[in-house]
Structures are given as C-alpha cells and as structure tokens.
C-alpha cells in the first residue's frame, strides 16, 4: 500500500518556492548531488528547476548510481523499471538489481532497450538458465554485431548454430549480421536468404544476396532460372530486374507473367520484343486461359492484328479458350472506326482503298466517314468498287437517307449528279425520274433544274405522261421546309405542261394551289 507521503509525492506537480533543501529531503523530493525533483506531465522531470529529463533517462541515471530512493520515486511517476536495471548494469549496482529481479521476471524483455554490447551481454547473463546460443540469437535479433564478433571463433566451429543465426538474421532483416557471417565464415547455402527476401518482398536483402553470391564467383544458371520463375510468378518487377543483371532468360519472366496475369511485368518487357515473340506469348495466354486484361494487353502490343490466325484458332479450339476471339471481334470494330477517321483525314484516296481491301472494310463505311470529313475524292474513288454506274447511283442514293449532316448530303448529291451526267443518255432515262424526286426531297434545286432539262429531251410520246406524273409526285413530296427555288421550278414546269396542253386549266390551278398552300 502507498503511504500518504507516497500519494502526495506521486501527484505533486508544483513545488512551492518556500520549500528548502531540508523540506525536500524530508519529502523525498531531493536527489543527492543533483538537486530538487519535480514531476512534469506523465513522462518528464525537472531537476533543480532548470534541467528537464525524461523520466526513463532519470531512472537509468539513478540506477547507475544505485540510488534506490530516487528509483522508487521515479517509478511512482510512471517510469519504466527496465531503465533502472539498465543503469544498474552500467554502474555494476547488482544490489539494486536483486531488489527488483522478482518484478522483472524475464530479463530478455530489457534487451531491446539496450544500445551498447557490453551492457547487453551483462543483462543477458542475469538469465541464469540461458547459454551462449541464446545470447547470440538475441544479439542477432537486436543487431548487436560486436557480441557476435566476440564469439566468432565459437561460431566458426558450430556450423549448425552459424546457419541458424544466418537464417534468423534473414527473418529479422539484419543486413550487417548477414554480411558479416557470410564474409567471415560463409554459410552452406544462400538459398534461404533469397527465399526469405522474396517472401518478405525485401529487395535490399535480395540484392545483398546476389552481391554475396557474386563474391563467391558462383552465379549458377539454374539458380537464376529458379529466381526468375519465383519472382515473376509473384509479379515482383524490381526483383526480376535485379536478377536479370546477373543473367537469365526473359522468356521465363514473360511466361510466368502470362500464366499469373501480371500485366505490369508484361507491359514492361513487351515493348522490347519483336512482333513474332509477342504472338508466341499470346498463344500461351490462350493456352493458360489468361484474363481479359492480359489478353487485351498482348493484343494492344500487336495493334489487334494477328498474322498467325490459323495457329491462334487451333489453340482456341484445343484449349477451349474463346475469350481472345470475342476480344478481337469487339476490338476490331472499335479499332477500324478509330483508324478510319485518321485514314480519311490524312491518307490519299488510293491509300484508303488499299487499307479498305486489306481489312475487308465495307465501302459504305468508308464513304460515310469520308462524307463526314468532306473528302469528295475518297467518296468518288471508293464508289468505283461498284463497277456498274447504275448500281453506284443506287447505292449512293440509299446512303443519302442515312446521313445526318446537311453538308454531307449536299456533297453526296453533287457526287451522284456527277455520276449521272457521265451516263449515256439511254442510261440516264432509267434513273432521271427517281433522282428528280430525291433532289426535290433534299432541296437540291440546282440538280433538280438540270435533270428537268434532260427530261425535255425525251420524245414527246414518252415525255408528256411521265413528266406530268413526275410533277404530281413532286407535289406530294414538297413540304413547308422546301426551298423557294424548288417551288419556282415546279411552278414553271406546271405552267409549261398547261401550255403544252398536257394539263387542263383545272389541273394546273389545283397543282398551283397545292404548291403554295
């Protein structure tokens, strides 16, 4: 139980100025040769009202002096007894240690707090039932290399202990200890170092392993292969690069990367490979049923164009892996759209035609993109794929209705009219009336006026009834959106038909009424 005095000392944070040295000594708040003691917060003290120390540092000093009264006071102030023991060991104050050894229990718990090797060894010696092996294991754990150096002769004779310490140094990542053991006494096998480095993702240890291995002048090809397989299987790019400094086959890395879907590895190395090698790994990806992202990455480095199609299909069937086909089909569409835009914008009509044939792109698709980019030359050149002029006109006429842009429609109609004008007169007659109605519907006044002139060249027997029917059909097509020029042309020809007695006055008036209602 705490005495009343202890309770007061524990909770007293401010010392009255009137307290002299005698009063402080009576209260137990005076440290001989140092001065008054005052608590500051939970983990600091004030000595002589001007020197601030951490409570634990003060405990170490008190322990070193063997001053149990100050130790007890500082323990009341939430100090750590372990620091008092460390100080006692430094000052050889074993009487003080014996007073508290029952409270300590396990002296191994103090070892992490000790900085110097001599005190470390003295502390470990307090554990009566521990020998040299235990000391060296703890020295390894807490990086106390001087202790290991002290026992170098014993370690050189005890091979098993040396190998054990080396493995522990790997597990605890004690690089100085690793270097010292290998460089002074050597270990039987460095594989344990590499295995632990890989499992812990410790690149520093991994690199150190190769330095030590290189010092032996024994970098085996089989070991490099094993390391490349392990590190690539885990997707450890920097470990792979470190291994490749000493040799090894990059194909091993890429095979593992494909198998385990490590795209970071793939992306790094694929850029360095020729197309033929990338196709080989694409086949492996199909065989291993790689993920969609892995397949996409491989295909992207091939620009989604695979030359060994037959072999690819054989792998797809043999390994029942159809994902690559789905990706190719989907990406091929998207890629062609993107490529078409650039082709039409920058390439000549001849070059576009060549690529269109190579990739089996439909001419309608090319023409629509060319219309969008206002490339009249490509529209004309591509349309020659239909050798028959009448078929060309029919195909282009069907496309007019699918084009959203007005400027595109006008351009296409000009191209169509140019094709029409190059027809022989007998062939023109086959399409002129259909084209005339299209021109009215699309407000193409110039082309409509021109085609009406051609109609007048027909002999009267054929001209009169067909032209009259054309005018009647056009009246059904015109709308409020029809341009004034179209209406003028229709009015002119309706009056002309009346003059030629092809229409009655009643028909003429009805037509004009419909035209301007």
Swiss-Prot record:
Keywords, in A-Z order: Late protein
InterPro entries: MGF_505
Factors inducing expression: Expressed in the late phase of the viral replicative cycle.
Pfam families from the UniProt entry: DUF249
Record flagged with keyword Ribosomal protein: no
Keyword set includes Ribosomal protein: no
Family the entry assigns: Belongs to the asfivirus MGF 505 family.
Its job: Plays a role in virus cell tropism, and may be required for efficient virus replication in macrophages.
Protein name: Protein MGF 505-2R
